[in-house]
Amino acid sequence: GLQGSNDNFDLERLEVLGDSFIKYAVAEYLFLKYPLEHEGTLSQQRSRFISNKTLYSLGKLKNIPEKIQSIILNPKINGILPGFVLKPEIELHLQNIKAPSDTWARYANVTEEQFKEEIKKMEDGGRKSCYNPWTQHEVSDKSVADSVEALIGISLLVGGRETAMNFLGNLGMEIYNGTSFQCSLPVPSALLSKEEWANEEVLRYYDKYCLDRLEEKIQYTFRDKSFIVQATTHSSFCQNKVTDCYQRLEFLGDAILDYLVTGMVFSSHVHCTPGQMSDLRSYYVKNETLARAAVKKNLQCHLLYLAPKLQASIDKFISLFQNGLDDDDEIFTEDDAVDLEDVEVPKALGDLIEAIIGAVYLDSGKSLQRAWDVVQVLMGDIIEETMKKKDIPMNCVRKLYEMVPTGIRFDKLPFQEDDGKAMYKLEIPGLPPLIRSGKNYDVAKIVAAKAGLRLLKEKEERGF
């Protein structure tokens, strides 16, 4: 049932759960199916698998739109009398003249000329949907895709991962051909060479960079040390010739973390609205939160990189963190920093945690329980602190609209070709216009929203 059906329940919470599962299932499949593809290609392929267009097409083939409850079930408004049938010639005539569905019931009460005149007026107002209101309903493509995700979510709840995978197979999604997770593709080694020297080199890196201490911090001992070496190797660390960098593991770990966190939020916040669930999930998996978790466990000292700019960014973030950075402080990432006063959150720290989660998952034989144990070790205190808070953290753009419900306006400005920056203009009632830039328009909008929140906070502190 859609939210518009005004029933006691709807699909939206299940949709959030199903969305995270399909993202995880497809990410694992692509990671194992294409061991030589880099993270960018895998992300593009995953987007094709899980897009609303794909889910809509699969749902339509299975006649799911016919099963959706999209309107209020009210006999006085849309009920049909027993034995009532619209004559085929009347239905064909109404369709030919493109009569909007909410006018069909009045056809017998007016003359043909009056009815056509009424239709013309409604068309001028943009009302053009024409269908039989007693035997058909109007459902958007996205609603069909959302329903498919909700069905995946309920399959997961009722029967677990295997049932959800079987449902994906029955839908026609080409991952594992509908077979079991346990019978899926083998896990490849992280080593780039099968020669004996490669194993020796991995152990040398393991000892040289004290990765045994990292294992102690995450409370997991790797059986295949090549996974932990890969998980800690930044793309700038060209000295490592035996494994790839962590980007592929980060792609997998991101999906696993999203799935595990969504499941935790779904089960522990039963009274949360779908919007609040999404806010919580976004808060737990965003780069700021992961960077805080990494610094709390001092994981940055195990990151292998050769990038002075990244070193400066990490040092600056650690300094701020040690000086008592508050969780509510607005922080800018490397991608959206606009001046020296903005605090940079090194994306590599969040990527490191995601790569470690992906590495643990593979090394443990694709055990979600082991991966969740590591998540709890790294982020358990952050999750516990958030649960104690009265207010649920939310996206900065949404938070801005919550604080100022009316009058806010975001305007895109022309792309700056000279420095490759996208720009957004933000207007808030009672404040001067703000112009902020970023590497793309999505980032620029977030930067502008964060700047607006800071101004509102300063205004409130001054008592205006």
Model regions and ranges:
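Double-stranded RNA-binding/processing signature
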Residues: 1-464
